[in-house]
């Protein structure tokens, strides 16, 4: 019997951050609130969050669900009574597509945030979903982002390319 022994030193730095924190955004194809399927590998905090590994939504998968966890809401470093949560969606050109805000109570130290977005009318493109948490009184904030794709071949985008020949013509000929 052949074997090889490898010894290596590994330094692990524990995550001991005492201020506001947020997990990565998990995008999902399906989310079941209050799931009783606690043995599922997709079970988290009473939700069954079924991932979508290719991150492609649109005609065949019209709804994107998201799941994220927020930590240390009761940190002494935070000054505001509420933490502002901004959910922002950008297209591949950086254009703001949608924005929504809400205030998060600090009555518990951790919380789960979930939501959904219908994408059946979005044109084919790549998008970035950003969640930002802001403590306005201490002027601090954190954010996390997730890129995903929408494929909707039936949605025709009006060309937004604008031209202005007037300035060029007048400078050349005027």
Predicted feature residues:
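Intrinsically disordered, low-complexity terminal regions enriched in Ser/Thr/Pro/Gly
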Residues: 1-174
